[in-house]
């Protein structure tokens, strides 16, 4: 099982490859207290476990955004270097290291090409699958040499005419340098002008542009088809055939995507994820093809006009232009499938190796798991991977070395392991120096892995390289040389919901001079969608917390003095021990879980309370035993973490009342956890009377909105007359 977010070793993982629920970590602390009681008639108790597979117009909006404002100070300060100093620095390291051996390619049926270099011992080990040679540079293949215009006697003709109104041109090439400088200065000083609007489809849009004292901020009109998008002709046919009309949320976001503005989309669902993935693939491939087309045109022009003094700036320091950050290998497969669907290469090199190592069949035992769980963990759910894609005129190559790649797809863990190696001499992030489009898909899933890896990668984007890597500095765009690439780069982040960590990307890493937009849904509230046949009392208790750093202590004090004292009194004073049990305590944070677990084990207040505690670190047998004891009444209380529920989606039986130490980040979890009250049909009425009690503070504003609804959350955060709110 994965370690907690931002905890563990140097490269702590999310959910890794291998047996689900297995871990070598054992808690050396008392994690439960068992009470011997007379068993009731639970003839099917064990069967329930053994057959289950292991596995901002609103008034409060400003307050919500302030939750992540402290992270602004963490932004990496980057110092621009003078042009001459940069040239001298890089030329020192420009000594050739000798070309790698050119690989002979063998044609296979189906138009696929595969490397003819055999793997050691006849099989690929983990190092090969991860691509330990990702940073090695190779000579171009025969096909690439033929495709290069220099070898074509300077003859190169494009199938597209240049358009001065093309966002690709206006954003990267035809930029007024004085205006760009003003916008960059405003972005550096965090001076943004914004507008907020709620549109009829149930979305809240916040658009911001650098404040240079000109004009007002307005929203762009919806984009309903590709006819107004400046696409390469090669893409237009497949795009319009696959997506004849842009609908839903995508029509409101597409203008900003194709306009090269930063996008934070917080309404990702299993139903709209495929459409969004296709639109992003069209945009990514369009950017790659236009970048390549511009370079080839200028190469041809230089070959024809060798005596002319041409100043053609069309490149970055290195080749990779698009970076995908994805949670699992199967998510990578889906992204690549979208890319190939629109690029339609005549040949795909190493495709079989890619499918063999990245794709897998879904687990059939998960048919009863929630849809979002099956989407995230279906197929190959390994979170340790990286992949380079290289595009030529007719071919797409998988597993290309990063410095020869156009698109890099990776998990945060997989990419960081190659960037931040133990040997300082092997550390390298120059391949990220010229990334112009970053796509972070399913950011909430990455949050449940190790968010520190995401921050590390983003902090190392668009830094000036330490080596030249064969760069022609006379062709490098001036804003690269001025160390301003991060203000031109486009970042697109999609998430099922927005947390303070994800929200901080909007304020810290989204600095696009063209502007940025944040899209969030208007929430009806998870409390209105509880899957129970009877109404259940849902009580929310607010406690005072001065700062986010003091919030854990304030929460713990409120829980032990107010909630737990009442809970212990009810358990110990009840004559019927079986009815006294059944209390599930749901704890979002693992650190809070450890603190509460230790308190239950050592405090005199809970001496007479039998309890169990299971988290994402618990072994399967520990979890099974604790759930069985809880269901049989031997545990009166069960402590249960949000990350364990994220990775397992257990159905906990025997629940008669629920205490939420904090509301869950994922609003779907509210209905699933409260639904535990109805798993025993005979006791559902009694369980509904036990109800749910949840603790919250002002720093829970973002996730509280998802639980109680957009219309209710403002009053609950500001209410002066009381701190308890009950919904039935």
UniProtKB/Swiss-Prot annotation:
Belongs to the UTP25 family. GO terms for molecular function: rRNA binding; U3 snoRNA binding. It is found in: Nucleus, Nucleolus. GO terms for biological process: maturation of SSU-rRNA from tricistronic rRNA transcript (SSU-rRNA, 5.8S rRNA, LSU-rRNA). DEAD-box RNA helicase-like protein required for pre-18S rRNA processing, specifically at sites A0, A1, and A2. One of its GO terms (cellular component) is nucleolus. Residues 67-76, 122-146 have a biased composition (Acidic residues). It comes from the Eukaryota. Residues 7-18 have a biased composition (Basic residues). Component of the ribosomal small subunit (SSU) processome composed of at least 40 protein subunits and snoRNA U3. InterPro entries: P-loop_NTPase, UTP25, UTP25_C, UTP25_NTPase-like. Keywords: Nucleus, Ribonucleoprotein, Ribosome biogenesis, rRNA processing. Residues 1-172 are annotated as: Disordered. Residues 33-54, 107-116, 147-157 have a biased composition (Basic and acidic residues). Gene3D superfamilies: P-loop containing nucleotide triphosphate hydrolases. Residues 22-32 have a biased composition (Polar residues). Its main location: nucleus. This is U3 small nucleolar RNA-associated protein 25.
């Amino acid at each position: 099982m994965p370690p907690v977010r931002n905890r563990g070793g140097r490269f702590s993982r999310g959910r890794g490859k291998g047996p689900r629920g297995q871990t070598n970590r054992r808690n050396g602390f008392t994690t439960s207290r068992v009470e011997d009681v007379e068993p009731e008639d639970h003839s099917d108790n064990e069967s329930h476990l053994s057959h289950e597979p292991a596995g901002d117009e609103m008034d409060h909006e400003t307050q919500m955004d302030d939750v992540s404002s402290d992270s602004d100070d963490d932004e990496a300060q980057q110092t621009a270097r003078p042009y001459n100093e940069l040239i001298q620095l890089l030329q020192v390291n420009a000594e050739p290291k000798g070309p790698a051996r050119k690989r002979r390619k063998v044609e296979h049926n189906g138009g696929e090409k595969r490397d003819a270099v055999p793997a050691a011992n006849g099989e690929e080990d983990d190092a090969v699958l991860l691509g330990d040679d990702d940073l090695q540079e190779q000579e171009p293949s025969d096909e690439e040499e033929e495709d290069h215009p220099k070898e074509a006697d300077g003859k190169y003709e494009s199938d597209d005419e240049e358009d001065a109104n093309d966002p690709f041109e206006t954003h990267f090439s035809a930029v007024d340098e004085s205006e760009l400088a003003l916008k960059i200065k405003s972005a550096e000083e965090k001076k943004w002008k914004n507008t907020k609007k709620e549109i009829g489809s149930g979305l809240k849009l916040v658009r911001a542009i650098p404040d240079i004292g000109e004009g007002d901020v307005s929203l762009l009109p919806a984009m309903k088809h590709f006819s107004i998008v400046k696409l390469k002709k090669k893409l237009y046919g497949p795009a319009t055939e696959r997506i004849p009309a842009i609908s839903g949320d995508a029509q409101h976001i597409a203008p900003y995507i194709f306009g090269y503005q930063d996008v934070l989309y917080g309404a990702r669902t299993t139903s709209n994820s495929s459409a969004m993935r296709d639109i992003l693939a069209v945009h990514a491939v369009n950017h790659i093809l236009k970048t390549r087309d511009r370079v080839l045109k200028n190469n041809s022009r230089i070959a024809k006009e060798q005596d002319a003094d041409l100043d053609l700036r069309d490149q970055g320091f290195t080749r990779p232009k698009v970076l995908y950050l994805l949670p699992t290998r199967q998510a990578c497969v889906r992204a690549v499938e979208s890319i190939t669907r629109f690029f339609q290469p005549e040949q795909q090199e190493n495709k079989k190796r890619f499918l063999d190592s990245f794709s897998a069949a879904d687990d059939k035992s998960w048919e009863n798991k929630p849809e979002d769980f099956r989407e995230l963990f279906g197929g190959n759910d390994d979170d340790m991977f990286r992949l380079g894609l290289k595009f030529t005129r007719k071919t797409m190559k998988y597993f290309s070395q990063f410095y020869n790649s156009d698109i890099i797809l990776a998990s945060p863990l997989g990419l960081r392991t190659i960037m931040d190696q133990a040997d300082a001499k092997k550390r390298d992030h120059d391949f990220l120096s010229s990334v112009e489009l970053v796509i972070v898909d399913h950011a909430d899933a990455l949050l449940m892995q190790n968010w520190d890896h995401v921050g590390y990668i983003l902090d190392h984007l668009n830094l000036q390289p330490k080596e030249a890597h064969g760069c022609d500095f006379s062709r490098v765009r001036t804003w690269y040389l001025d160390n301003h690439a991060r203000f031109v780069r486009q970042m697109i982040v999609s998430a099922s919901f927005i947390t303070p960590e994800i929200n901080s990307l909007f304020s810290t890493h989204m600095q696009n001079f063209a502007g940025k937009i944040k899209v969030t849904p208007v929430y009806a509230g998870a409390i209105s969608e509880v899957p129970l046949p009877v109404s259940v009392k849902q009580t929310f208790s607010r406690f005072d917390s001065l700062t986010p750093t003091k919030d854990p202590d304030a929460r713990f004090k409120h829980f032990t003095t107010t909630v737990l004292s009442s809970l212990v009194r009810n358990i110990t004073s009840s004559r019927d021990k079986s009815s006294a049990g059944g209390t599930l305590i749901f704890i979002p944070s693992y650190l809070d879980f450890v603190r509460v677990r230790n308190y239950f084990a050592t405090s005199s207040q809970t001496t007479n309370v039998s309890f169990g505690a299971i988290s994402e670190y618990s072994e399967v047998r520990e979890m099974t035993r604790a759930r069985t004891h809880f269901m049989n009444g031997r545990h009166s209380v069960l402590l249960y973490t949000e990350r364990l529920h994220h990775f397992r989606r257990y159905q906990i039986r025997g629940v008669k009342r629920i205490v939420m130490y904090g509301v869950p980040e994922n609003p779907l979890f509210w209905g699933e956890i409260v639904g535990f009250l109805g798993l025993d049909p005979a006791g559902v009425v009694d369980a509904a009377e036990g109800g749910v009690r949840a603790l919250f503070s002002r720093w829970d504003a973002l996730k509280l909105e998802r639980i109680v609804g957009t219309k209710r959350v403002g009053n609950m955060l500001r209410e002066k007359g009381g701190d308890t709110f009950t919904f039935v």
